């Protein structure tokens, strides 16, 4: 059949939207739902939570530690994070609900981050020692909860911030 509308694209360029599969917009999205400058660069989908560094789950007492992780890994300004992050969530389901309520200029997909899960369960000990079996079980439970809330998976890296040793043993234990 015939199209309802024809668009004259003569002299124009057309491209599909870009999926930015490695972003660290987890904090920025709380104060900049436009995710500047991504949309201007053709990004239509951003995947957040990469490398295991996320801002949820996070108890109020752990906010400073979570923000310091971002300054170490991402080179973000601690002052900007302190002034910018709108902490109207603690759990990953609450963070995902906040993303839905607020909306964004692009589609968002979020990983559950290893570092934040460890911090939620282990507090300041998270980067200093290996997790106990009970702590790993609690992190697995939180990961399941995150997946039920819409997280697309689990993100980690070999950063010492995840387990104190910089090895993948702790993450590997989650899937056995």
Which residue stretches match the model-derived regions?
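Alpha-helix capping and helix-loop boundary segments enriched in small/acidic/polar residues
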Residues: 25-29, 130-134, 170-175
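Active-site core of metal-dependent hydrolases
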Residues: 149-176
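Short low-complexity, flexible loop/linker segments enriched in glycine and/or proline
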Residues: 7, 60-69, 168-173
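Di-metal (Zn2+ and/or Mg2+/Mn2+) metal-binding site signature of metallo-dependent hydrolases
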Residues: 13-37
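Active-site beta-loop-alpha junctions enriched in small/polar residues
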Residues: 24, 113-115, 157-159
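Active-site environment of divalent metal-dependent phosphoester hydrolases
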Residues: 26-28, 53-56, 158-165
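Divalent-metal coordination cores built from histidine and acidic residues
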Residues: 31-153
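Histidine-rich, glycine-flanked metal-binding segment
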Residues: 1-17
């Amino acid at each position: 059949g015939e199209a309802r509308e024809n668009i004259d694209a003569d002299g124009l360029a057309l491209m599909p939207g870009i999926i930015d599969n490695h972003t660290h917009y987890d904090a920025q999205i709380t104060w900049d739902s436009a995710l500047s400058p991504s949309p201007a660069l053709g990004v239509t989908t951003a995947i957040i939570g990469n490398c295991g560094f996320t801002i949820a789950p996070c108890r109020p007492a752990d906010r400073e530690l979570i923000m310091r992780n971002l300054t170490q890994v991402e080179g973000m300004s601690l002052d900007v994070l302190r002034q910018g992050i709108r902490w109207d969530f603690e759990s990953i389901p609450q963070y995902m609900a906040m993303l839905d309520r607020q909306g964004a200029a692009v589609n968002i997909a979020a990983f559950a981050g290893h570092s934040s899960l460890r911090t939620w369960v282990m507090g300041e000990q998270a980067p200093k020692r290996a997790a106990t079996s009970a702590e790993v079980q609690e992190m697995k439970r939180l990961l399941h909860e995150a997946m039920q809330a819409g997280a697309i998976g689990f993100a980690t890296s070999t950063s010492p911030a995840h387990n104190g040793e910089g090895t993948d043993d702790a993450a590997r234990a989650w899937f056995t």
